[in-house]
Amino acid sequence: MKNINIKILITLAILVTSLSIEAFAQTGGNWPQWRGANRDGISKETGLLKQWPADGPPLAWKTSGAGGGYSSFAISKGRLYTMGLRGDKEYVIAFDVATGKQVWATPHGGAFRNDRGDGPRGTPTIDGDNIYSLGGDGDLSSIEARTGRLNWTMNVLKKFGGSNIVWGISESPLVIGEKLLVNAGGPGASIVALNKKDGSLIWKSQSDRAGYSSAIPVQVGNTTQVVFFTHTRGLGLDLKDGKLLWEYPRAANNVANAATPVVRGNRVFISSDYGNGGGLVEIGADGKAQEVYFTKDMRNHHSSSILIGDHLYGFSGGILTSMRFDTGEVAWKDRSVGKGSIVFADGNLYALSENGVVGLVEVSPAGYKEKGRFRIPQDSLPTWAHPVVAGGRLYLRDQDTIYAYDVREK
């Protein structure tokens, strides 16, 4: 009788564990593309820890197999997607969010190699049943999310006559409706809109060299614009036909323009580092943009700023900075975490520094207030893959290794 009861308890424990994993897979959060659903770095998660334990939040799982590179994560329907270099090929890889186990891995292009680190830089974009990914050497692919089956692939540099940039193509593709948009950097085809179903060309525009930034849409009246940050300028194009509506070269540093522009209403903040700065432009009813201000107090390098309330929060060089969006007035600056990248969730910034330190920082223009920190246990440095908060977990990547931390408030 005692043995039967033990067997029943073991069976129940296995059943509960299985149900918990299945439930998590169904509610494991939604982060479908670079910087989240709206490309703004803001997670809709609530019920998260307001203060971390001394050694940081508990580790839910850790897995290897992400490969080399700095690709961040896209998360949907219980799957986490990223890209990585394995051997001489770049792969799009799917992991189970509940366990960290690999579901599939699909090769989609050749290896990008560089003295600042090999492998892909961009993040996959989930749209419906498919994933769109752009590798470090310009390989663009459409892959079925459930199975990993390759729908189509092309090299945008070869297709449109562009040449790779110094530290590799770093863009995360933008999907709007039927259009798949990328900064291909070719003559007469700097920006291309492709049919997401088969990769066929819808329109092409401009001749700028590619930048490292990822695009973002902005709605002005009845017109949807797409804002790109190329090698030489920020610019707004009409989504319908690629017509140039405005340009803003002052924000560009002509070295590495990497930050994604920040949008609120008809205003767009565009920023770069290498001693340059950032500017706010306002788009009028005619679709043209005028500068509101330019400042050297917010110089985004790899990491984009996040707009929360009336203030931008971002790394200006290596200094975490809070600045009023409409005026450029600085609220505070702090060096405590060090240079890195950020994501926002439930009242706090999750800051990942290049040296592997992770900080929880309360969002307030009143001043810097840290609520906990820890260091990822193994780091290859620099940790450039941007953090993600989804489904009550903080996801971090250090090259081949992915960490999932439970940040839910118990």
State where each predicted segment sits:
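N-terminal secretory signal peptides that target proteins for export/translocation
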Residues: 1-6
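Bacterial N-terminal signal peptides
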Residues: 9-22
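Noncatalytic, solvent-exposed loop/strand surfaces
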Residues: 24-410
